[in-house]
Amino acid sequence: KLPHQLVESFKSTLDEVHEADLLLHVVDIAHPQFEAHIASVNELLAELKVQDKPTLMVFNKIDAYKAEAYDETDLVLERGSEHYSLEEWKETWMSKTEGDAVFVSAAKKTNMEYFRNRVYQKVREQHITRFPYNHFLYPEIEVEE
C-alpha cells in the first residue's frame, strides 16, 4: 500500500492523468508484492475516476524476476502465485489485460522495441478513433514480440 501522506502530496501531479490519452502503468515484477502495488495504483486511479483510461501494463525488471522454489512432493504447501514462472505471469496478465501488457527489462533493453511498438499502436488507435480521416499520420506497423 502507498502511504496516505505520499498519495496526498502527489495528488496534484496525479491529476495530470485526466489529460493523458494513454496510461503506462509500470510495475516492478521482481518485487514480491507487485500485485498489491498494482491494486494500490488501481484504487488510486479509481479515486481519480480515470480507471477506464486506455492503459498499457509495463512489467519491468524481468531480468531480476525469480519465482520462489516449489517442492511438488510437499503435500502441505500449496503452489501459489509466488511460485509462478515468468511465462505463467505473462499468460495471466495478457489474459487479464486483454493483451495490453508488455514484459521488459529496461536495464538490459529486453523487449524495448516491442514496448515502443505497442505504445505507438495504442496511440495510433486513439488517434484514429478521434480523427478517423487522418489515419495516414500514423502508418500501421507490425508488432511482434
Predicted regions: what they are:
Residues 2:
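Conserved structured catalytic cores and adjacent interaction surfaces
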Residues 6-31, 43-50, 105:
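Inter-motif core of Ras-like GTPase G domains
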Residues 32, 36, 40-145:
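C-terminal-of-GTPase-core extension/linker across diverse P-loop GTPases
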